[in-house]
Amino acid sequence: KLAVVRLGSLTPVEEITGIRDVIEINKPEAIEISRDKKLMKEAFTQNNIKTANWFTYEKDCFIQHCPGNFITGIDTEKLPYPILSKSRTGQGGSGNTLHKDQKSLQEWMKGKTLSNYIFEEFYNYAREYRLHVTQEGTFLVWRKMRKSDAKDRWYFNSDNCVWIGEENPLFDKPINWDDCIQQCVLALKSVGLDIGAVDIRIQSSEDKDGNKRKTCDFIVLETGSAPALSTIGSEFYYKEIVKLINKKL
């Protein structure tokens, strides 16, 4: 039986093959939700995913999106600062801007098509991890660790970080790692993907006094259907995709 596997592609089956009875891994509609931050965050909110408080700008005011509810009529003065503006289709941190106060945000807003952005409360948690997951669980994980000479230290991406594997002592698995995995799987399910990457941001294992935390607060940042993969990552994906195809036979 023919299988179509999408890692970021939106190409429908009929443009790939005349055969309609095919196995699909990551359907186009799931990728569409995952790649658009507004659609993705709506899916998170509807499914009670542990994620940052977020807002859109509509009809001259900000709207906060909450599970089963909206809070309307919010002006820039009442937003939780610092706040992030995020391009709905930006990747790898592109299109993201940190606004420390109302003045910064108002200056940035001038001349922008604000419907192309979402806005998130900024959580300055010390660590970020990427979990590669299926709806069964995780199969590959990395810690993003900032380079010592990184200038902008409010975000983590491939330019200012190195990637630390789970076997490395610096990985420093959080005490509530199972909760993190559970939320990442739920996030993947909420957007409809079969396989993909989920980024989380989380508190460090110790508090400011050096005491071990009993739990580490965290948020799910986003899902990704086309993550950058090393040779090792590609091998892991190949094995998991084969499993997914066999399961759907």
Where are the regions a protein language model picked out?
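Conserved N-proximal alpha/beta basic substrate-recognition cap immediately N-terminal to
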Residues: 1-73
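Anionic group-transfer/hydrolysis microenvironments
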Residues: 8, 88, 122-123, 132, ...
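Short acidic/polar capping segments at secondary-structure boundaries
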Residues: 30, 59-62, 88-92, 103-104, ...
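Active-site ExK catalytic segment of metal-dependent nucleases
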Residues: 40-41, 86, 222-224
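ATP-grasp fold ATP-binding core
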Residues: 44, 71-94, 114-126, 142
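Protein kinase-like catalytic core scaffold
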Residues: 83, 139-140, 196, 217-222
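Phosphate-binding site of ATP-dependent enzymes
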Residues: 97-187
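C-terminal active-site "lid" helix and adjoining low-complexity regulatory extension at the edge
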Residues: 189-193, 202-249
